A protein has these predicted regions:
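Initiator methionine at the very start of the polypeptide chain
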Residues: 1, 21-22
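N-terminal amphipathic/hydrophobic targeting modules at extreme N-termini
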Residues: 2-13
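Intrinsically disordered/low-complexity terminal segments and short unstructured peptides
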Residues: 1-2, 70
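Glycine-aromatic micro-motifs
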Residues: 22-178
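Short, Lys/Arg-enriched N-terminal segments with co-localized hydrophobic residues
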Residues: 11-21
Length: 178
């Protein structure tokens, strides 16, 4: 593991050695995996633990040959609302495949103060998050991808301006602004 911006980077996408099948792992979602319907299909045993905010990071749409997808990158003074899921080993393997880890996204560990979904109680937990490789360029997402993410934002009661700001930046950087 290496440190970056105060976070530990988990090299590659293999599961942590010694991870017990009974141990809970906490996964941070900020994009399409906020969508409850989609997560139920992809990771049927995952459970929503709560919500949190990643401070000093911003939400961006970045691209590949197949389109533009959300990622987060460090930016002082910014923040990103997230949901935190408990996942099993099988769920994490499904997420690795979906996220294209380690080629498209890589994993980082971070500690977050998570507000429990049922109790509202704040708990500090070590979680993992997928982050797109930084050299990817800003891109314009498909409407269907944005809708999927927006459904998740609505489900969790997140302010939609974070998503809108990421879209506006993508359009401006692509040269489509008036």
């Amino acid at each position: 593991m290496t440190a970056f911006g105060g976070l530990k980077v988990v090299e590659g996408c293999s599961l942590q050695k010694g991870w017990s099948i009974m141990e809970k792992r906490y996964y941070i979602a900020y994009g399409s995996n906020l969508n409850l319907r989609q997560m139920k299909m992809r990771c049927p045993t995952a459970k929503v633990m709560g919500t949190a905010v990643i401070k000093d990071y911003e939400l961006l749409f970045k691209g590949s040959l197949t389109g533009a997808y959300l990622t987060i990158e460090p930016k002082e003074g910014s923040e990103v609302p997230v949901a935190v899921w408990t996942v099993t080993e099988a769920d994490e393997e499904a997420l690795d495949r979906y996220e294209g880890c380690p080629v498209f996204y890589y994993k980082k560990d971070m500690e977050l103060d998570i507000r429990g979904i049922r109790t509202g109680k704040i708990r500090k937990r070590k979680c993992f998050v997928y982050i797109m490789h930084e050299e990817r360029k800003i891109g314009i997402p498909s409407l269907s991808y944005v809708r999927t993410c927006l459904e998740g934002y609505i489900s969790f009661g997140f302010d939609e301006h974070y998503l809108s700001e990421a879209q506006i930046r993508a359009v401006k950087e692509a040269g489509y602004e008036d």
